[in-house]
């Protein structure tokens, strides 16, 4: 018996689900070169526009000159350098937690935290729309795994009543494909009533949310008692790479001792930690970036409503435009690209069948004029959709 990979790929193409990697030939920013074409992009998670910031670049360059390039080894061997340690201390202070622990990717941070905290005999309860890394972590943990209805505290409560062993409630802070916020006050209250811990992956919340960019926990005024396990990603609003888990002394020491994705992975380049220290400084000191971004979000939603687009209840830079079928989403994306606008079409299995969408992401680097250009292009392209696609 052989692996029939050709048939799998053919089926993927027939379902309009085949994915291709666009080739970025320029730095991150609103205007990019992709596959040889100059485009205005609304596809990046660089929410605060820090990925190409000259001070962040300079910090990376100086870090490489001082510390070299590679991490060299795992953190527990000889890969934990001074920049890593300083960044962990800065992230702990930023999040209001005693400790923080660096990881190479957000996927690894989520996998590490869940699998180190629960196992056979325990329970992990997750939002149905959680990121794939969280769902994978729950399945791989060996714990009893169940998903509650999206953002539904009563659905969570029913599952908490049946939970056994140590129970971990896991949710995205900002849901990456919908842009809505987890109802953390209600979820945390239910978890506390049942003696469960809450873990929040705030990959898309740090930077845009909170008075100082502290994310969804700061947005709702929740501390370590309500959210014992807080995960953040550095490759989005921070504009660099990697991730972290913040929490108590005991939590971080537990991850160091038991989290296999941490123990058996080479550390990230120290120079990246140097760059992230600078981006964290800018994230906290340049509040105008959040203010400008929030204004762009409000203006986009007003303009989209005038066009008649179907949006989701998102107060964040993630602004999905619901289209329906995968074919329809691809068509709208292609029409925008013909007009020099790059917006990705999100299709199943990333989102449920029948809910394909354009995932528009706004950043602090976008100008008012660029937003107006997007809205004008959307209005023009949307007017063409009923004639060309009637499968909505």
UniProtKB/Swiss-Prot annotation:
GO MF annotations, alphabetized: 8-amino-7-oxononanoate synthase activity; pyridoxal phosphate binding
Residues the record lists as binding pyridoxal 5'-phosphate: 106-107, 176, 204, 233
Pathway: Cofactor biosynthesis; biotin biosynthesis
Major enzyme class: transferase
Catalysed conversion reaction: 6-carboxyhexanoyl-[ACP] + L-alanine + H(+) = (8S)-8-amino-7-oxononanoate + holo-[ACP] + CO2
Keyword field contains Transferase: yes
Pfam family, any one: Aminotran_1_2
Family note: Belongs to the class-II pyridoxal-phosphate-dependent aminotransferase family. BioF subfamily.
PANTHER family in alphabetical order: 8-AMINO-7-OXONONANOATE SYNTHASE, CLASS II AMINOTRANSFERASE/8-AMINO-7-OXONONANOATE SYNTHASE
Quaternary context: Homodimer.
Protein name as it appears in the record: 8-amino-7-oxononanoate synthase
Organism for this UniProt entry: Stutzerimonas stutzeri (strain A1501)
Taxonomic path: Bacteria, Pseudomonadati, Pseudomonadota, Gammaproteobacteria, Pseudomonadales
């Amino acid at each position: 018996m052989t692996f029939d990979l050709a048939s799998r790929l053919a089926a993927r193409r027939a379902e309009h689900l085949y994915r291709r990697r666009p080739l970025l030939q320029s730095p991150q920013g609103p205007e990019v070169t992709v596959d040889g074409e100059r485009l205005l992009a609304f596809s990046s998670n660089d929410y605060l526009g820090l990925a190409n910031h000259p001070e962040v670049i300079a910090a990376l360059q100086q870090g490489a000159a001082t510390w070299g390039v590679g991490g060299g080894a795992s953190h527990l061997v000889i890969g934990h350098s001074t920049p890593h340690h300083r960044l962990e201390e800065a992230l702990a202070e930023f999040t209001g937690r005693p400790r923080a622990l660096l990881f190479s990717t957000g996927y690894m941070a989520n996998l590490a935290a869940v699998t180190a905290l629960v196992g056979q005999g325990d329970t992990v309860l997750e939002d149905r729309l959680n990121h794939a890394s969280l769902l994978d972590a729950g399945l791989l943990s060996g714990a009893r795994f169940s998903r509650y209805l999206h953002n539904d505290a009563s659905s969570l409560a029913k599952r908490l009543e049946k939970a056994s062993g140590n129970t971990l409630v896991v949710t995205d802070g900002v849901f990456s494909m919908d842009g809505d916020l987890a109802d953390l006050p209600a979820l945390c209250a239910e978890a506390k009533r049942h003696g469960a811990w809450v873990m929040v992956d705030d990959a898309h919340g740090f930077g845009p949310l909170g008075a100082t960019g502290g994310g969804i926990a700061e947005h709702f005024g929740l501390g370590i008692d309500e959210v014992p396990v807080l995960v953040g990603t550095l490759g989005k609003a921070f504009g660099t790479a990697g991730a972290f888990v913040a929490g108590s002394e005991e939590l971080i020491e537990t991850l160091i001792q038991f989290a296999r994705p941490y123990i058996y992975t080479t550390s990230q380049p120290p120079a990246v930690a140097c760059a992230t220290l600078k981006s964290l400084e800018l994230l906290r000191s340049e509040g105008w970036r959040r203010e400008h971004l929030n204004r762009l979000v409000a203006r986009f939603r007003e303009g989209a409503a005038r066009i008649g687009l179907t949006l989701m209840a998102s107060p964040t830079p993630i602004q999905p435009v619901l289209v329906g079928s995968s074919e329809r989403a691809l068509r709208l994306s292609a029409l925008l690209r013909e007009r020099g606008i790059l917006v990705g079409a999100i299709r199943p299995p990333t989102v449920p069948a029948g809910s394909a969408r354009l995932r528009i992401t706004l950043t602090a680097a976008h100008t008012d004029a660029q937003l107006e250009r997007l809205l004008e292009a959307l209005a023009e392209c949307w007017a063409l959709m009923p004639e060309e696609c009637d499968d909505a």
